[in-house]
From Swiss-Prot:
It is found in: Secreted; Cell membrane. The gene is efeB. This is Deferrochelatase. Residues 1-28 form the signal peptide. InterPro entries: Dimeric_a/b-barrel (IPR011008), Dyp_perox_C (IPR048328), Dyp_perox_N (IPR048327), Dyp_peroxidase (IPR006314), EfeB/EfeN (IPR006313), TAT_signal (IPR006311), TAT_signal_bac_arc (IPR019546).
Amino acid sequence: MSDEQKKPEQIHRRDILKWGAMAGAAVAIGASGLGGLAPLVQTAAKPSKKDEKEEEQIVPFYGKHQAGITTAHQTYVYFAALDVTAKDKSDIITLFRNWTSLTQMLTSGKKMSAEQRNQYLPPQDTGESADLSPSNLTVTFGFGPGFFEKDGKDRFGLKSKKPKHLAALPAMPNDNLDEKQGGGDICIQVCADDEQVAFHALRNLLNQAVGTCEVRFVNKGFLSGGKNGETPRNLFGFKDGTGNQSTKDDTLMNSIVWIQSGEPDWMTGGTYMAFRKIKMFLEVWDRSSLKDQEDTFGRRKSSGAPFGQKKETDPVKLNQIPSNSHVSLAKSTGKQILRRAFSYTEGLDPKTGYMDAGLLFISFQKNPDNQFIPMLKALSAKDALNEYTQTIGSALYACPGGCKKGEYIAQRLLES
């Protein structure tokens, strides 16, 4: 089908959305919590029949890299961004020391003390995951550009330590960004195979940040693979993440994800995290033909195979798929990133009455200017998928390397 033939149909789809839109007031949601007034107490794990099973669900916290990046993709995510309100770097150091202690405890399956001598103080632990396994819990921290510099002024004496590629992602033609759905001085990505375990971890981390940071946004996502480990599917029903390289290949991960040199010392073993909250127009998509859907992606919906091939993992032949398809444009750049996306649903959009759902796109790369942004520009300019999606949140974060026992996350940055 020619571009001239497609154009009226594309306008019609956009009009559907416009006709369905209604004026609505913006709703601001604030988050707050009670800080821990008593020191954190760790209890020894009691032997039980569940011990062996729980050990299999523990992702090590300490290491060269932070967990939650090349870790096997979990089912649930809570993704939060915070703005720092503290004026002194010492407060930030205290926060990251506390966060490290809590994260190490929770990811290893240990519990905070259930006993509390003073009943007139808030409980140390909110308690909702007390009887649950660690469920492959991981917590990943990152820093936004505003952590280092704000309104042209150095913050905490760390401007000289700002990573060289850390800046707000450039705005794209199809963006409709809400500043409260992107950005932030600090990000926290909490992943687990049990939603309640993930929520509990984030809730207690945010409680510890009261008085030091304000919550900017919190997103909840999910993504389930098949029974036999098949590639998960997004809300459009297509396989999501087929092009990812094996995270078990250290050489590949060093070439795509992990920073070894050329950045401030604290970024060694770290990476950059790109975040895009992408709204999907599900009602319009659901009324599109299977042919249009497959032409949009450049893959078969059922098998995930690229056009002209039989299997999902077969190589893409660019001359056999539409030039404006999502796969064609992503592959034509020759760039590689590590995708770690999740779907989200947030009820109904009060402005349109349609379902408020989409994709929490998260990717990791060692050089966003060379890897992610060229791909983003190519997709934003011509991607047929843009007819069915709109980005409403955007951010780029620098994730420090991991830490050893006795250290805390970002120590090389905060004590440099």
